[in-house]
């Protein structure tokens, strides 16, 4: 389920109307209630709906035909209890649960994915005319009767959009599957709990039984609160995936309020802790296994169905994505333009430090434990490595924060500050790897020694506790996974710059980082690594609860606490200020808002205001990339998008037929293209990428409309229809206000890629075609790269004339490219376009990163780079040839 928040204003554009604002007519009289708008631009008032529990189980709410069927299906589960054998009942309910769970995650998932990408459900409704009053088919009558029974006899089906009516029917399938899924799970819980003469409260001490029941009930109640709070926040619209069918006006951004401010995707994460509470109460590994199974499938559903749709509808704009890309690319500039090694992630065989890290990790994690004589020696090694890492890293960070010792040393030795951060990253990661490798090696040694023992009783010797082995394994692995997930979430939020304490080493004026982040995992927690950053060590202790592991947990926790609260925090306050550092996290806000009495909330607010006035600070974690706001992504017609992405090739015969314009031989309308070149007779005329194209049109005076227009299209996308254009021109068009005239298509009006194109003359603001021009080709210009730098100026002038002048306005070949290119709304695309044009024109491949790595790069510098690249490539080619001759 997606989450939404109110926004102020929204403007809807018709993607098939050349960027002009569509006039949206409401389909019913204006009344109170939220306003909806379909993806085709039809507006309506969204009627009130109820949640599934109220709809199905509240006797005061009218039951529809489908709802009565759903209730019958739910109560039919009781028939299984007529079977006397409880184990058979468990098998049946597990099979039913698996069926409904797969129906949820793969059935509903498939429908939603196709609805999001292809408008499938709405297309079905339109294809079979399910909501047409005159349709007398059994399916249509059943569907219409269902809606009438839901909404009442006075509900006018025809007055509401097909999208909304389809959503009403889709909701009933959701009700059936979700309620059946939950009911069958509860049946599994009950049958498992009463197994073996009510085993859930037998064979355990009373305090442990009560603890399980109390803690399990707490998880279930917390789960219930999460669901209720989430529904109160996002309402039925998002609960039933309404934004897959239509949008609510002024509800166009993701919400981060209530439970959505506590954890990411609460409906899929903490929204399933109640399942584990049921497993705890039932004291059943069977229940735990199916709870894990269901939760795992739900995370798959989130990743492959929910998140892609959220990104499409609520994701960042192109400019915001562009900014994020720039920041991430500039983040790598501090690490030699390669992703640095984090643990053993981003491993590169061509990087010496990575090889050393791998060798050390294997040595301390595997080789030493294989030859160690005792656990004690491995324990001493692990403690020694952790103490060495803690003291050295904490000392260096403190000295760098207060005295800039690393920066001063680097500058005194003519080493750039960026290089000092890269060197620090290698040192920091190497020491962290050594500590975790030693910890892993200690536990591997323990396992090897215990497994080699012949006495079965010795297998649990040395453990602080040995019960609940499988539960310990599950919880331990879960904690280890959580630490990995938190670490990668931190890197995703603050980048490698933040992960390696970049603001300790790089001056703020030279960094793209200006503010502390409030995005990603930092939206919910100020210091996620303070607890979760070491929970993997706690997980290892749960799997092997030895005294040695317990001491290691203490070392990791104490070091983490000192580093964050006494080193990082003070540096952040000094760098970013107390007010910036002192903000409440999402969890803190939610606890204050929902779990603390109002009197205490007011008292805390007053205390915080007083603290800010008097300079009292709590502090928070390191810096990161600027947080970005999510904006509404434009909804595109998927059929048109398929055409746009078409890679169909036209045959030469087809091109000849198109060039003859047989369909418009006797037309009073004409389109001609001026300035095209032709290499040989019979070949298509062509122009070069970025060159302005001038067209002239002629139309009859008496039939001419000021809303006539001309658009530019790829032939491979429009050859399907010669009389009507079914594809948007994407802004590449112009009005024909006069009966005869000319227009120059340039810059954003052009296609910037090779291919065959045509112009189309359309009538009266519509898409009926009156004339199609002859096809023409857009090619890359051919530029020869000189062999020596003496001709760099001449070559640079050619680059400026044939490539750069078509994209950006530079006065001369020595002017820096970056300041001018950065004025563009999408600088990454500008750099990619220039690099692509250069690569195709010179036959020397370069990437857009050369423009990012050198802020003062000029056209002449680019020319020199190309000359040098050509020189190196020719030398390598010559050497290869020479070697072959010598052989």
Curated annotation (Swiss-Prot):
Membrane topology, from the record: Multi-pass membrane protein
Membrane-spanning segments: 64-84, 92-112, 174-194, 206-226, 262-282, 285-305, 355-375, 378-398, 424-444, 473-493, 531-551
EC number in record: 2.1.1.17
Annotated GO CC locations: endoplasmic reticulum membrane
Superkingdom of this protein's organism: Eukaryota
Region (Disordered), start-end ranges: 610-631
Keyword Transcription listed: no
Biological pathway: Phospholipid metabolism; phosphatidylcholine biosynthesis
Enzyme class: transferase
Keyword Transferase recorded: yes
Catalysed reactions listed for this entry: a 1,2-diacyl-sn-glycero-3-phosphoethanolamine + S-adenosyl-L-methionine = a 1,2-diacyl-sn-glycero-3-phospho-N-methylethanolamine + S-adenosyl-L-homocysteine + H(+)
Keywords, ordered alphabetically: Endoplasmic reticulum, Lipid biosynthesis, Lipid metabolism, Membrane, Methyltransferase, Phospholipid biosynthesis, Phospholipid metabolism, S-adenosyl-L-methionine, Transferase, Transmembrane, Transmembrane helix
Lumenal side: 1-63, 113-173, 227-261, 306-354, 399-423, 494-530
Molecular function (Gene Ontology), one example: phosphatidylethanolamine N-methyltransferase activity
Subcellular location: Endoplasmic reticulum membrane
Any one biological process term the GO annotation gives: methylation
Family matches, as Pfam families: PEMT
Residues on Cytoplasmic side: 85-91, 195-205, 283-284, 376-377, 445-472, 552-887
Function: Catalyzes the first step of the methylation pathway of phosphatidylcholine biosynthesis, the SAM-dependent methylation of phosphatidylethanolamine (PE) to phosphatidylmonomethylethanolamine (PMME).
Protein name (record): Phosphatidylethanolamine N-methyltransferase
């Amino acid at each position: 389920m997606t989450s939404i928040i109110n926004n102020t204003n929204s403007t809807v554009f018709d993607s098939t109307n050349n960027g002009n604002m569509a006039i949206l007519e409401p389909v019913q009289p204006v009344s109170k209630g939220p306003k909806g708008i379909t993806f085709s631009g039809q507006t309506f008032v969204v009627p009130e709906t109820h949640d599934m529990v109220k709809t199905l189980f509240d006797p005061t709410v009218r039951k529809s035909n489908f709802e009565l069927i759903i209730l019958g299906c739910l109560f039919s589960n009781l028939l299984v209890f007529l079977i006397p054998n409880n184990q058979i009942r468990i098998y049946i309910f597990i099979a039913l649960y698996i069926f409904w769970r797969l129906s949820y995650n793969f059935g509903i998932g498939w429908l939603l994915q196709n609805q999001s990408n292809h408008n499938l459900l709405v297309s079905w409704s339109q294809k079979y005319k399910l909501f047409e009053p005159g349709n007398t088919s059994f399916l249509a009558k059943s569907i219409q009767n269902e809606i009438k029974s839901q909404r009442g006899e006075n509900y006018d089906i025809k007055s509401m959009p097909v999208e909304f009516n389809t959503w009403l029917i889709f909701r009933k399938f959701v009700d059936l599957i979700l309620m059946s899924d939950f009911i069958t799970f509860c049946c599994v819980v009950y049958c498992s709990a009463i197994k073996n003469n009510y085993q859930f409260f037998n064979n355990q001490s009373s305090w442990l039984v009560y603890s399980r029941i109390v803690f399990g009930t707490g998880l279930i109640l917390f789960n219930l609160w999460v669901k209720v709070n989430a529904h109160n926040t996002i309402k039925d619209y998002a609960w039933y995936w309404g934004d897959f069918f239509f949008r609510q006006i002024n509800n166009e951004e993701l919400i981060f309020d209530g439970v959505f401010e506590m954890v990411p995707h609460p409906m899929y994460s903490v929204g399933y802790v109640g399942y584990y509470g049921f497993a705890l109460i039932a004291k059943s590994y069977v229940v735990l296994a199916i709870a894990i199974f269901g939760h795992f499938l739900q995370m798959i559903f989130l990743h492959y169905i929910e998140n892609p749709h959220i990104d499409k509808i609520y994701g960042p704009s192109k400019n915001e994505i562009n900014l994020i890309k720039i920041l991430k690319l500039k983040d790598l500039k501090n690490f030699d333009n390669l992703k640095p090694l984090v643990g053993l992630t981003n491993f590169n065989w061509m990087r010496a430090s990575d090889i050393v890290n791998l060798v050390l990790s294997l040595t301390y994690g595997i080789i030493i434990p294989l030859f160690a004589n005792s656990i004690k020696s491995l324990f001493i090694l692990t403690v020694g490595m952790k103490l060495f890492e803690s003291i050295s890293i904490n000392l260096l960070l403190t000295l760098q924060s207060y005295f800039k010792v690393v920066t001063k040393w680097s500058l005194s030795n003519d080493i750039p500050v960026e290089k000092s951060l890269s060197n620090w990253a290698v040192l920091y990661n190497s020491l962290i790897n050594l500590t975790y490798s030693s910890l892993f090696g200690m536990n591997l040694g323990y396992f090897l020694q215990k497994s080699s023992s012949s006495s079965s009783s010795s297998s649990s010797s040395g453990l602080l506790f040995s019960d609940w082995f499988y539960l310990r394994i599950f919880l331990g692995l879960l904690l280890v996974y959580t630490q990995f997930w938190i670490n990668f979430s931190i890197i995703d939020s603050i980048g490698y710059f933040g992960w390696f304490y970049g603001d300790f080493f790089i001056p703020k004026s030279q960094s793209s980082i200006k503010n502390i982040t409030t995005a990603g995992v930092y939206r919910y927690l100020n210091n996620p690594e303070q607890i979760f950053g070491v929970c993997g060590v706690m997980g290892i202790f749960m799997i092997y609860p030895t005294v040695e592991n317990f001491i290691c947990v203490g070392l990791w926790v104490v070091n983490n606490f000192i580093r964050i609260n006494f080193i990082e925090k003070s540096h952040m306050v000094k760098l970013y200020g107390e007010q910036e550092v002192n903000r409440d996290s999402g969890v803190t806000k939610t606890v204050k808002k929902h779990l603390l009495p109002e009197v205490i909330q007011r008292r805390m607010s007053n205390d915080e205001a007083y603290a800010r006035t008097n300079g009292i600070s709590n502090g928070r974690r390191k810096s990161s990339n600027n947080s970005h706001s999510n904006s509404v992504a434009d909804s595109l017609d998927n059929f048109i998008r398929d055409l746009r992405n078409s890679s169909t090739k036209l045959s030469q015969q087809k091109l000849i037929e198109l060039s003859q314009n047989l369909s418009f031989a006797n037309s009073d309308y004409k389109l001609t293209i001026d300035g095209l070149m032709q290499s040989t007779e019979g070949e298509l005329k062509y122009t070069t990428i970025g060159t302005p194209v001038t067209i002239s049109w002629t139309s009859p005076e008496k039939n001419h409309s000021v809303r006539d227009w001309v658009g530019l299209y790829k032939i491979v996308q429009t050859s399907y229809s010669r009389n009507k254009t079914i594809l948007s021109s994407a802004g590449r068009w112009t009005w024909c206000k006069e009966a005869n005239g000319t227009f120059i298509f340039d810059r954003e009006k052009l296609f910037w890629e090779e291919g065959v194109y045509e112009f189309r003359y359309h009538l009266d603001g519509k898409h009926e075609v009156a004339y199609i021009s002859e096809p023409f080709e857009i090619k890359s210009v051919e530029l020869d790269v000189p062999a020596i730098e003496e001709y760099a100026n001449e070559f640079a002038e050619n680059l400026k004339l044939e490539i750069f002048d078509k994209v950006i306005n530079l006065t001369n070949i020595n002017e820096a490219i970056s300041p001018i290119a950065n004025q563009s709304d999408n600088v990454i695309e500008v750099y990619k376009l220039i690099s692509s044009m250069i690569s195709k024109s010179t036959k020397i491949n370069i990437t857009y990163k050369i423009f990012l790595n050198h802020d003062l790069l000029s056209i002449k510098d680019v020319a020199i780079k190309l000359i040098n690249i050509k020189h190196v490539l020719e030398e390598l080619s010559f050497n290869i040839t020479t070697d072959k001759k010598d052989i």
